[in-house]
Amino acid sequence: MKNINEWHHIFKLDPAKEISDEHLDQICESGTDAIIVGGTDNVTLDGVLDLLSRIRRSHMVPVVLEVSEEETLTPGFDYYFVPMVLNSKEKKYMMDIQHKAIKEFIDMMEFAEVYFEGYCILNEDAKAFQYTNCVMPDLDDVKAYAYMAEKVFHLPFFYIEYSGAYGDPTLVKEVKEELQNTQLLYGGGIETTAQAKEMKEYADTIIVGNSIYTNINEALKTVEAVKGN
């Protein structure tokens, strides 16, 4: 299994969305470095467990649970990513939910498997932006959040999340220039190989999600586009 800092491509699956066994097998065998299980709406423990069991049935790809609600925490994942939404106006989305989850489930998870992410959501129309009550940052704000993620909180990841919309490559480039050790993740609106390549020029890791459900063939091509498999 690769170290996380060697991951270049991740698929993100929403346990509240339908995916056929055929498409799930294609995702798992695509050569992606990992699969994140996570979403915003209607995410339940049953949905998380069902998706995990379907992946584990015949695949060895690393699987990550993105912890947004403590009710969906369950053993069996290789890693747990805990988002801290830095541009939320509510402390609970940066600290309180995370604290509650760790307090309740710390004995269940090996701490080496738990990684905190500095999250910055940049799409005002996204459900995640509205759900976490975010404020829309400008470029200088985002660069400052990146600085905080690395220099203040010493987080392993800074995640630029456009959540369904394709983002600004120039912003991603400038944020990357602020980071030396923290790994830059980009997610949002990647639907083509050209977009995957463009964002991968600047981000350490790209995350492909929505296009799995809208155009599976193009989504699968993004793996080779950034990894050259």
Swiss-Prot record:
Keywords: Lipid biosynthesis, Lipid metabolism, Magnesium, Metal-binding, Phospholipid biosynthesis, Phospholipid metabolism, Transferase. Sn-glycerol 1-phosphate binds at K12, Y159, I160, E161, Y162, S163, G164, G189, G209, N210. GO terms for molecular function: heptaprenylglyceryl phosphate synthase activity; magnesium ion binding. Mg(2+) binds at D14, T40. GO terms for biological process: glycerophospholipid biosynthetic process. Its EC number is 2.5.1.n9. Pfam families: PcrB (PF01884). PANTHER family: HEPTAPRENYLGLYCERYL PHOSPHATE SYNTHASE, PTHR40029. This is Heptaprenylglyceryl phosphate synthase. It comes from Oceanobacillus iheyensis (strain DSM 14371 / CIP 107618 / JCM 11309 / KCTC 3954 / HTE831).
